[in-house]
């Protein structure tokens, strides 16, 4: 969890003589000289290069963990992942040239994608601030309404997709690419192989086979024993979307003709990363326009942007009610809303995308002065007072700092 900008370990700011104030704020000024910029700032890489170079193996944007980690074996659900050894005689392999990233021209993929992997749990590093990130668009593969409906049902029931917002969910559905399986006995994935793809079954059936050795062996029984099966609407290989852990089972087609939908890990992670990065940048821009928060440093705005919770309200619903305690601040991310006061006919104020309300709740818990009602379907970003104080300390301290910076105490 991010440290507070005003740790409790520090001595509280004393309100005494002018010399006391000057000394205290001089200390703040000196500390701010070494602050980092927001990761969404275009100068982030150069501004923090020196700090990054002083630490080897940093996890930020390209650092790595566990370079010397050994192989890991999984003996759990067959819906898992992994590297290739020998194939069972008489079984066809799913054509490797068909299993490539679905992004246009593999744009932005690491050079060593899916090459020479060891059987460790890891994932590629992606940098949202790298060149070309702003121009990247998720791949799109056309589907019928019936196909979209079935895929939506299949994806919605999977734990990996339960947290996606509407835009991310749509991008995932659009990125799924159709993979025909033309015959019976084709191995879609092999136990022990590195996993790169998640699959949804459109039609046909597939068996899950596990060999005690952890990989496919030569011979007629090289795939091991059947431990389960999946049919239309089912899915497998979801852990491949998180990291390239070894596949825990072999999946082989049962019917003469089947169809799968596939999504590769790089595209999935890029969708999540790009969406989160753009949302953070938007939130930071919103926060700059809030007078109460205008004195925040870039890294402080980044903290707040990450702490905002997105909430949806249907048209006509009440977001905050007049007279209720003020405990949260809201940014209107999309849609329109109106403010109403008891005894006043019609709205007293209207809000659109980029507007905010409830900011005084960050200062105290006085009752709300008006009700805010959604005029259309809206999406708001919510920040509670407790969350704000946990990240940055009391707003009063920030306002005091802003007052000093605009009117410094003379030496």
UniProtKB/Swiss-Prot annotation:
Residues 85-96 have a biased composition (Acidic residues). Residues 23-159 are annotated as: Dimerization and phosphorylation. One of its GO terms (cellular component) is cytosol. 3',5'-cyclic AMP 2 binds at residues 292-411. Belongs to the cAMP-dependent kinase regulatory chain family. Residues 46-58 have a biased composition (Low complexity). This is cAMP-dependent protein kinase regulatory subunit. The modification Phosphoserine is found at residue 120. Pfam families: cNMP_binding.
């Amino acid at each position: 969890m991010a440290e507070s900008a005003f740790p409790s370990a520090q001595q509280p700011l004393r309100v005494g003589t002018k010399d006391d104030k000057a000394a205290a704020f001089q200390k703040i000024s000196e500390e701010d000289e070494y602050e980092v910029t927001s990761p969404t700032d275009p100068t982030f890489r150069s501004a923090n290069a020196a700090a990054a170079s002083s630490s080897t193996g940093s996890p930020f944007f390209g650092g790595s963990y566990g370079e010397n980690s050994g192989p890991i074996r999984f003996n759990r659900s067959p819906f898992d992942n992994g590297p290739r050894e020998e194939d069972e005689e008489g079984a066809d392999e799913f054509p490797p040239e068909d299993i490539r990233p679905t992004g246009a021209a593999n744009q932005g993929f690491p050079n060593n994608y899916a090459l020479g992997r060891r059987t460790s749990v890891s994932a590629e590093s992606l940098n949202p601030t790298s060149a070309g990130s702003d121009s990247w668009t998720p791949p799109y593969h056309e589907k019928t309404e019936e196909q979209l409906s079935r895929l939506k049902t299949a994806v919605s029931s999977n734990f990996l997709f339960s947290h996606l917002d509407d835009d991310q969910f749509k991008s995932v559905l659009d990125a799924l690419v159709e993979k025909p399986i033309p015959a019976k006995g084709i191995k879609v994935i092999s136990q022990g192989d590195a996993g790169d793809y998640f699959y949804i079954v459109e039609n046909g059936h597939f068996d899950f086979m596990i060999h005690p050795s952890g990989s496919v062996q030569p011979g007629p029984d090289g795939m091991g024993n059947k431990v389960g099966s999946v049919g239309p609407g089912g899915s497998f290989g979801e852990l491949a979307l998180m990291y390239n852990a070894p596949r825990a089972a072999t999946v082989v087609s049962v019917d003469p003709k089947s169809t799968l939908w596939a999504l590769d890990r790089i595209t999935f992670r890029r969708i999540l990363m790009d969406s989160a990065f753009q949302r953070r940048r938007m939130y930071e821009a919103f926060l700059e326009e809030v007078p109460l928060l205008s004195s925040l440093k870039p890294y402080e705005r980044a903290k707040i942007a990450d702490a905002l919770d997105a909430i949806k309200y249907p048209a006509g619903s009440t977001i905050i009610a007049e007279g209720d305690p003020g405990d949260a601040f809201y940014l209107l991310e999309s849609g329109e809303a109106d403010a109403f006061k008891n005894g006043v006919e019609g709205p007293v104020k209207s809000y659109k995308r980029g507007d905010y309300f409830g900011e005084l709740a960050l200062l105290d818990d006085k009752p709300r002065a008006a009700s805010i009602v959604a005029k259309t379907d809206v999406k708001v970003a919510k920040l509670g007072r407790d969350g704000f104080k946990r990240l940055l300390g009391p707003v009063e301290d920030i306002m005091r700092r802003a007052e000093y910076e605009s009117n410094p105490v003379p030496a």
